Amino acid sequence: MARQTPITRYRNIGISAHIDAGKTTTTERILFYTGVSHKIGEVHDGAATMDWMEQEQERGITITSAATTCFWSGMGNQFPQYRINVIDTPGHVDFTIEVERSMRVLDGACMVYCAVGGVQPQSETVWRQANKYKVPRLAFVNKMDRTGANFFRVVEQMKTRLGANPVPIVVPIGAEDTFTGVVDLIEMKAIIWDEASQGMKFEYGEIPADLVDTAQEWRTNMVEAAAEASEELMDKYLEEGDLSKEDIIAGLRARTLASEIQVMLCGSAFKNKGVQRMLDAVIEFLPSPTEVKAIEGILDDKDETKASREASDEAPFSALAFKIMNDKFVGNLTFVRVYSGVLKQGDAVYNPVKSKRERIGRIVQMHANERQDIDEIRAGDIAACVGLKDVTTGDTLCDEKNIITLERMEFPDPVIQLAVEPKTKADQEKMSIALGRLAKEDPSFRVHTDEESGQTIIAGMGELHLDIIVDRMKREFGVEANIGKPMVAYRETIKKTVEQEGKFVRQTGGKGKFGHVYVRLEPLDVEAAGKEYEFAEEVVGGVVPKEFFGAVDKGIQERMKNGVLAGYPVVGVKAVLFDGSYHDVDSDELSFKMAGSYAFRDGFMKADPVLLEPIMKVEVETPEDYMGDIMGDLNRRRGMVQGMDDLPGGTKAIKAEVPLAEMFGYATQMRSMSQGRATYSMEFAKYAETPRNVAEGIIAKFQAGGKKGDDE
């Protein structure tokens, strides 16, 4: 089967924005105008086509990037048919993993901003992610019909907050309830959309008299931006004082692809105005798969040679699995972006990350939650495969004879964890299966079993992230679960060397028990030693027989697991068995194991024991206005500020080390201090001694019989 649309007429774009900028509504309109959905889905009714998980429709936020294919030939059918693959991305800070994941497979992006709220914190995070993957982008200012809408203020905010270089190619006619359409600066005509056909039809008209000067000023700005694309265009502009429509589009396109400028449009998706012109801009200014840098990877040879794959059907097959979803009807759906070659239904592919060969069952083209079976996918396509068992997010799929591993995505480690248990014992196995599947879909979510308590611990990127996981377990797998409070994993250690006797003697009728040891406990530098515990013996003259050394070691290690001070695992100790005695008849392994355990317990309390707490490396990015409040708050949380950097757009990056115990609820506090404009990331740095006043509270609770981990 030959290719239906030439690859030069493909556009793989992401639509991303801050929560409530109207991104899902914008995507809905795209599907409506391109003829994919016949009834417009409104988020207000919880019926949006792209938001297809139940939680999304309930909460009115987008969690998973659904990928959709649609076709567009221009507002006035002025283009041949183009194929647009749209990936809708979430706008909540706990889901940046989804944004990062979709940015990785896009060729271009459309940033949606609210005409009232402007550039908000998540917009800044998404902008940085788009910079990281060098994604060319355009901006759409939505909600022009809302009270307080101001297009030109958003243009300024893009410059100051994002360090962007926006070039408007339309200006709004009116604003708030008088918003009626836009002036197209390339055509220098007003565009008025027909309300009866929900904006399907439009007509060009004269520019309103009161807007002529504004339009002329912004047109000059746009033409100058286009002229800077090349010396040739600049010479033409200087000679003629203007550029033709074709030259303007060519100049703006070249600079957009080089990420030097961002073409900017506006409208109201809800009122069916402006999205149509934005679709034209996607075709005019965003790249096809052949216009972005060829994907790079590593070959399967001794030297791990770097190689690239051109976006062509003739090249060997290579694709990246960027999302895995569990579907009630077909099981695992693996979303892939094909970079090169062709894949047919039933073909075998090789996964170099897992060193496994797998066969593709069906290939489906997704339209939000509707699916259409197709026979093959080619370079530039985005589709979902059914039947892949061992693929996880970020894996490469390629031709078995031409193995290449495309660059892997990096996923942050989880920062919050809590215990979860099924409400009924019968659900235990169902819960394990559910958590396993969810962890496969989402690499930023982890599951493990706590060795001490036997509890199942789930870890993720934030409180909302884990809420939604628990919610999905209930809905998709029918498992009701109880969740514990967020926990900190403390550790215990010693600061000085001590020698301690340990004796275990039992004399009842018949055979007795006898174990007697002297153990020296020394502080061990975990980093230098490369281990958390070491056992040695310096026994002279056989006072403790060799066969009992292992038992003493075992007794000490078992005691270390559950701590002495506050019930947390002990680390950083070297135990040396140096003396003792035994009894020919009564000594056995158990006696020496108990003697070792007692020696450790008593010696530990004399060796200046301390509690260690996890310290996190925290980085807060905040506009300068809120810096004082944020620094003050970090100090109150026992944080140590390590340094500061200046970022574009007057943003400051504050780097600090803060105990994890002080970071619960931080996201909410930080958002309220900065009116939602600061963002933060945190990762584990090291363990450090807990200050005495904090440690005393934790120890007292443990000694009073309170459970460890309930450190509120």
Swiss-Prot record:
CDD domains: EF-G, EFG_III, EFG_mtEFG1_IV, EFG_mtEFG_C, EFG_mtEFG_II
Alphabetized UniProt keyword annotations: Cytoplasm, Elongation factor, GTP-binding, Nucleotide-binding, Protein biosynthesis
Subcellular location: Cytoplasm
Residue ranges annotated for the tr-type G domain, each copy included: 8-290
Residues that hold GTP according to the record: 17-24, 88-92, 142-145
Gene Ontology biological process terms, A to Z: ribosome disassembly
GO terms for MF: GTP binding; GTPase activity; guanosine tetraphosphate binding; translation elongation factor activity
Matches recorded under InterPro entries: EFG_II, EFG_III, EFG_III/V, EFG_IV, EFG_V, EFG_V-like, EFTu-like_2, G_TR_CS
Phosphoprotein among keywords: no
A Pfam short name: GTP_EFTU
Gene Ontology annotations for the cellular component aspect, listed alphabetically: cytoplasm
Described function: Catalyzes the GTP-dependent ribosomal translocation step during translation elongation. During this step, the ribosome changes from the pre-translocational (PRE) to the post-translocational (POST) state as the newly formed A-site-bound peptidyl-tRNA and P-site-bound deacylated tRNA move to the P and E sites, respectively. Catalyzes the coordinated movement of the two tRNA molecules, the mRNA and conformational changes in the ribosome.
Family of this protein: Belongs to the TRAFAC class translation factor GTPase superfamily. Classic translation factor GTPase family. EF-G/EF-2 subfamily.
UniProt name for this protein: Elongation factor G
Organism field: Acinetobacter baumannii (strain SDF)
